[in-house]
Amino acid sequence: MAETPRLLFVHAHPDDESLGTGATIAHYTAAGADVRVVTCTLGEEGEVIGERWAELAVDRADQLGGYRIGELTAALRELGVGEPCYLGGAGRWRDSGMPGTPRRRRQRFIDADEREAVGALVAIIREQRPHVVVGYDPAGGYGHPDHVHVHTVTTAAVAAAGAGNFPGEPWAVPKFYWSVFATRPFEAAVQALTPEDLRPGWSMPSAEQFTFGYADEHIDAVVAAGPHAWAAKRAALAAHATQVVVGPTGRACALSNNVALPILDEEHYVLVAGAAGARDERGWETDLLAGLEFGAAPRR
């Protein structure tokens, strides 16, 4: 029997997996791959959309994190993934919030003991033995402190998983990617949005709000979702109802700031470790598994 491809995605908060990599996850689960998602916090500091669940917010009942476990569970189900996997266990590290967010009763993820956090992720990597790990770039995408720390922890864990500093059998990850936004495709998708795609009160994004995109020449891979994966991404986003609203046509969504974001059917990556596979005329891989060989399934 041929070995099953295995991919591991590491994200900061519930909804990050759907916003940035949802179509990719759905694409590979539909193809039969073993896809797992690690979430590093419960997302307790998220801003709640609407009045229905407003009392769960951090400055009220402070129950949002527990509620979002259910949202993440539903979103992962839409993407074809099993139960949530929280780094260190659900609630081990608290959502750090944006800069200036006051400290709460629980230890923030950005204050986590690095060896403990890295060791927890090394254990997951050595158990799953993924062919591909996906994390964030050094800026954490748009700069959220937890995203930046996910980059630090994931980078260290990928390196440590192949060495002997933690318990378990070492596993050298063949390919390690950053999930990134590509500027040109994002801008094209924004320009393609129409008033019919937006809900009342939404605004269009400005160039000043999205300065963290990557130029084409800095992209290494793209996963173009088919209709099934794109629909799964939309459904997963809708499952995060305290954080995301999907527009009437399903072509856009918005967070609590009511800025319309196109729901992209292509997701982009930078390869930071490992050998690239075949590239297209743009110089991009079109498969994160490109260049990997899958023989007989290994015995455990």
Swiss-Prot record:
Keywords: Hydrolase, Metal-binding, Zinc. GO terms for biological process: mycothiol biosynthetic process. It comes from the Bacteria. The keyword Ion transport does not apply. Its cofactor is Zn(2+). Binds 1 zinc ion per subunit. Zn(2+) binds at residues 13, 16, 147. Its EC number is 3.5.1.103. GO terms for molecular function: N-acetylglucosaminylinositol deacetylase activity; zinc ion binding. It catalyses: 1D-myo-inositol 2-acetamido-2-deoxy-alpha-D-glucopyranoside + H2O = 1D-myo-inositol 2-amino-2-deoxy-alpha-D-glucopyranoside + acetate. Catalyzes the deacetylation of 1D-myo-inositol 2-acetamido-2-deoxy-alpha-D-glucopyranoside (GlcNAc-Ins) in the mycothiol biosynthesis pathway. Belongs to the MshB deacetylase family. PANTHER family: 1D-MYO-INOSITOL 2-ACETAMIDO-2-DEOXY-ALPHA-D-GLUCOPYRANOSIDE DEACETYLASE (PTHR12993:SF26), N-ACETYLGLUCOSAMINYL-PHOSPHATIDYLINOSITOL DE-N-ACETYLASE-RELATED (PTHR12993). This is 1D-myo-inositol 2-acetamido-2-deoxy-alpha-D-glucopyranoside deacetylase. It comes from Mycolicibacterium paratuberculosis (strain ATCC BAA-968 / K-10). The gene is mshB.
